[in-house]
Regions:
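Class I S-adenosyl-L-methionine-dependent methyltransferase catalytic core
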Residues: 1-218
Length: 218
């Protein structure tokens, strides 16, 4: 079963990113430390099997930590783009707009989050078009049904681990201490059965009304 096509999303460069957490600075140029990238790639390889025959996609390549880790782990092919690449194996491009010559790939990334996940969710849904597995470092708000309801329904969450990252700068040095962000790494798998949308029953506790009839204002 394939979910109907979703409406087009804005490009990564077109989405206005507002400061919402300590990771968001301009174009969110904090990078995943290489040892952490290697650890997560190893986890993915163990989870999916046949890693040596797989194509790996890194949609926010940056300094190439995931690219190098995937290559060392033996991936058959690694494709990566970034709007401001900092590594020779990362191509210049907007992931939300570039063509992806892959099928049943594995997408591994620490994508840009954006305010209220305005970037991370479009990145996931774009990756879902060509992937069998997706492993993303994301805010822990991704555990909420309100976020997961916006993700491609063909994908099912198979693992979710807490993660606290000390981000690094373009030179691999520790970035500002305030950038520590409570995140998680989620592993998603494409399945033929659609994931159900979570619906919350309206208990009628709060109702929209006019100012004249309201009991309280928020």
């Amino acid at each position: 079963v394939t979910k109907p096509a979703t409406k087009p999303t804005k490009s990564a460069t077109a989405v206005k990113v507002r400061a919402g957490n300590t990771r968001v600075t301009g174009k969110e140029q904090y990078y995943t430390p290489a040892p952490l990238a290697a650890k997560l790639v190893a986890e993915v390889a163990a989870l999916v099997g046949n890693f040596e025959s797989r194509t790996v996609i890194e949609p926010a390549g940056g300094t190439g930590s995931f690219v190098e880790a995937a290559e060392r782990a033996g991936a058959a092919r690694v494709l990566s783009v970034d709007i401001e690449p900092k590594h020779e194996r990362v191509n210049l491009g907007d992931f939300l707009e570039v063509e992806l010559p892959a099928h049943n790939a594995i997408t591994i990334s620490n994508p840009p989050f954006g305010r209220n996940n305005s970037l991370s969710i479009p990145f996931f849904n774009r990756a879902a078009e060509v992937s069998e597995y997706i492993a993303f470092i994301v805010p822990r708000s991704w555990r909420k049904w309100s976020v997961q309801n916006r993700l491609d329904q063909n994908f099912h969450l198979v693992r979710d681990d807490d993660l606290t990252i000390n981000y690094v700068d373009v030179n691999g040095q520790d970035a500002h201490a305030k950038n520590r962000l409570r995140t998680c790494v989620q592993y998603w798998e494409r399945k033929s059965k659609l994931r159900p949308i979570v619906k919350v029953k309206d208990m009628g506790i709060i109702e929209r009304t006019t100012p004249e009839l309201a009991d309280a204002a928020m």
